[in-house]
Amino acid sequence: MSKKKKKSPGTLAENRKARHDYNIEDTIEAGIVLRGTEIKSIRRGSANLKDSFAQVKNGEIYVHNMHIAPYEEGNRFNHDPLRPRKLLLHKREIEKLGTRTREIGYSIIPLKLYLKHGVCKVLIGVARGKKKYDKRQDLKDKAVKRDMQRAMKDRY
């Protein structure tokens, strides 16, 4: 059984399934607007990016379906776990993302949630969905590469 990969020090949550389901063409780092109980919950490690996506509306960009579990000590000040969260980007970056997502087949997917100098950031990617045969081809390529690595290792 393979060992579980360690997260890099600042990484709080990662959407590993996104790289399997989508071809990521471009990535952008964005800030995110969070409430106090949300950041405490994220720092505790209870954020989930699975099935999350971003949408451009009225010149602003929001992340939907990003689950942040309620903070246990937050009592009545707790947040809604699935509320849309605003991303902080420059206007021209939002316009660029908006034009890309208007093309058929493109989506904005959050890839990673991490801390940078004590501030929470989201790495978002402009992605196009993979077809089933694309996924199979990627798995075959990965297996071939692994076999080549094994052969090279045995050689030396």
From Swiss-Prot:
Localization annotation: Cytoplasm
Chief subcellular location: cytoplasm
Gene Ontology terms describing biological process: trans-translation
CDD domains: SmpB
Function comment: Required for rescue of stalled ribosomes mediated by trans-translation. Binds to transfer-messenger RNA (tmRNA), required for stable association of tmRNA with ribosomes. tmRNA and SmpB together mimic tRNA shape, replacing the anticodon stem-loop with SmpB. tmRNA is encoded by the ssrA gene; the 2 termini fold to resemble tRNA(Ala) and it encodes a 'tag peptide', a short internal open reading frame. During trans-translation Ala-aminoacylated tmRNA acts like a tRNA, entering the A-site of stalled ribosomes, displacing the stalled mRNA.
Family: Belongs to the SmpB family.
Protein name: SsrA-binding protein
Organism annotation: Staphylococcus carnosus (strain TM300)
Gene: smpB
